[in-house]
């Protein structure tokens, strides 16, 4: 298609005030030039539908520039998986599409409501489905999280995570779906020709993955006991929150539940295996079978947890009862998940879904604090892998730590702690003591 035609079509569509844009090809692979040449984009508005091929540098620059010029203040860009489109143009052509108008990504909004639909085929289908989302009872919460968390991830943070890469004998890239997992966490899978999945790095991969240059090292920061602290904050359980103030949550929990000293790492590890699982629905039989404890001991553990932490247990149990009645549940921040069966899963949804948003919010904070200093290599749930030049290591560690432990506006007065490790190789990461 001639560049003048691309510009003409975009101008005509944006003159209507709102344009739906999506990839015809699904997820676009910026790691493979031959696949990239097949890229096509659907444009649809009240005046009709067009498909625009973007098969070389010239057409890519014309297309991106035309969108940036046309989508000015007051215009609406209606999208399906806009994050992947940004990543494609950055990774393949080095072009960052920035718009002044309003971006509405239906894939994100529907996913937050656990609606599993395919990409709309037209502007009119998009608007019909958007209307349904906006009529939902949780729209105000959905919209707030979309603007506060999802938009920054779509426009800046996740495209950078996807395009920054990591080295072996070649550069590999991770692909993320921002609301891909049912409990709100990002989903990562191999969508590219040259890709890896940070969530399931094998021992063999750990041996060969390395930073982007010889002067850099890995810095890994991750939250400690996040779900226990989130459970305490959400349920307002004084007993849980008292545990969270202790030096070691699991050691204190073990001693509180079993009334004996937690004087070995094995005992602490045992507590980690049953504490949250009981809240999430594990029975005494499950503890006995999976952990190997006698049935009487397992029954005593379950009873003690229910009695000591009665406030939080009743709170989390209410989510299961709600799921049994309504066949769905809504978390603290308005995310909806359907439960046609296995209603007990509403228990961990009640905690893990808000925890996922907390981690994504802090990913945004971390990105903003480091953007003039270094880059984030990848994100795995409550963990963040960061690149650091050796001469900037102390600054990167302190800046990252300050960002991650600072208060989150969505969860006032909830404070987390993090651990840190550093290494040139993932198999040689050494723990670093952080300031309190």
Q: Each predicted region: which residue ranges?
A:
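Conserved DEDDh/DEDDy metal-dependent 3′-5′ exonuclease domain
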Residues: 2-4, 14-134, 225
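Acidic, glycine-rich two-metal-ion catalytic cores of nucleic acid-processing enzymes
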Residues: 25-38, 42-47, 143-262, 322-370, ...
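Mixed-charge, glycine-rich, non-catalytic linkers/tails in nucleic-acid processing enzymes
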Residues: 90-91, 96-166, 235-244, 311, ...
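Catalytic palm subdomain of template-directed nucleic-acid polymerases
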Residues: 113-116, 132-134, 283-292, 384-400
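Polymerase palm active-site segment centered on the conserved acidic dipeptide of motif C
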Residues: 305-319, 391-436
